Amino acid sequence: SLTINNAKKIQTQPSYFDSFVGYWKPQVYPTDVELYQDRVEWFTNNHLDATKISDYNNFGVSTDVTDDDAISVIIKDKKINKINTAIAGNKLVVFTDSGNFIHNNDTFTPNSATFLKQGSTGGANVKPVIVRDNIIYVHPMKQAISGYAYNFETDGYAGQDITILANHLFENKKIKELAYQQEPYSIIWVLQEEGTVLACTYLRQQQVIAWTPMDFGGKVISIGVLSDGSNQELYLAVQRKNGTFVEKMPTRLPVADPKDRFFVDCGRTY
């Protein structure tokens, strides 16, 4: 549940924040939520509503607007598109069906909450992941993935399709979830809607992008990466004939005995 604190209301719009929860109805629930510059941001249709700084239940605005007041922004484009997802890193990036929009100021205040369109690919309602300085996001049709990063040559953000060399793995299939395993091998895990999983070894600085289909012997319905303190591990919810199970993929770490290093598709020991 969400409690709205309206201790300080804006005089010119006295009912706006009173009805804030009211327009979160079944057809217009927030599509995503993020934490950026110590504010919680909620995304509904083409609106972004952000709380006051360090006061995550407070959408109040004072009579004389101050830098820590709540923020309400409409993401503007040639046509109205609802916000499908967003992700916060050094900048807040918002994805609609027709564009990628980035907060283009150093501070996020009521007077500096402007967004610049930096790309027309758009993004689906699949949560992106951050791989070092790169945002990995799914295209609107959910059949391709791009990496989104700052380009010094163009002085702007640009996307690169990282699935173009493995199109056969995405034909007639839609992407459901992404997960990123930073250690030990920098792998992006991709779950497709029919339950198949792909692994992408991704090292942008070395220009390494390598895709591999994974067979887990069942239908995977969700994926996630968790840390155990020493390594990051992939967890999967897998539907099998005798039920649904949460499973963990073993980590491929170096071992002392060469016989235990046998990780190949086809091989022979002699």
Q: What name fits each language-model region?
A:
Residues S62-D77, G89-L92:
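Core mixed alpha/beta domains of very large multi-subunit molecular machines
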Residues T31, N84-T85, K91-V93:
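Parallel beta-helix/beta-solenoid repeats that form elongated, surface-exposed shafts/blades used
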Residues S1-Q27:
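Small/polar beta-strand repeat architecture
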Residues F101-I102, L198:
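WD40 beta-propeller blade core
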Residues I83, D97-S98:
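Short glycine-rich loop/turn motifs
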Residues Q27-D69, S98, N104, N111-Y148:
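Carboxylate/His-rich catalytic cores and anion/metal-binding grooves
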Residues W24-V28, K78-N81, N90, P110-F115, ...:
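Beta-sheet repeat architectures centered on beta-propellers
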